Amino acid sequence: MMKLNLFINANETESYIDIHAPKMNDHVQSIINAVNDLDKSHTLVGYIDKEIHIINVSDVITFQVINKNVTAITSNQKFKLKLRLYELEKQLPQHFIRISKSEIVNKYYIEKLLLEPNGLIRMYLKDAHYTYSSRRYLKSIKERLSI
């Protein structure tokens, strides 16, 4: 059981969080990730032709670079974004994982993984398609997915 203390002090100039724990573990790390995600963007602006759409980040399955444009792919739409992939990566919550130079995947949409003989990971996503990780990101992917 975790204990929570809240201290309201009018003399404080900004809000901050201190975490006290006997050791670092998955539970503590998930709290840190949740707090860090509070400052992250939860919506994005996407374009379909000349239409402007507000996209809920949690609906995005993957962000891919297609013909030099960053595209947000949901279960039923593809939206062009005006951000570069590296800019987007900084804004996204922790459950988005960079898997290659041209793709970021929402880990909540990963259905299963297949380790290929060549060292790549084939990721099957819930929208019935699959994608591949690059070797360069393999260590990071394994850490983020705890495999």
Swiss-Prot record:
This is Uncharacterized HTH-type transcriptional regulator SA2153. Residues 44-147 form the HTH LytTR-type domain. Its main location: cytoplasm. InterPro entries: LytR-like (IPR046947), LytTR_DNA-bd_dom (IPR007492). It is found in: Cytoplasm. It comes from the Bacteria. Keywords: Cytoplasm, DNA-binding, Transcription, Transcription regulation. One of its GO terms (molecular function) is phosphorelay response regulator activity. It comes from Staphylococcus aureus (strain N315). Gene3D superfamilies: LytTr DNA-binding domain. The keyword Amino-acid biosynthesis does not apply.
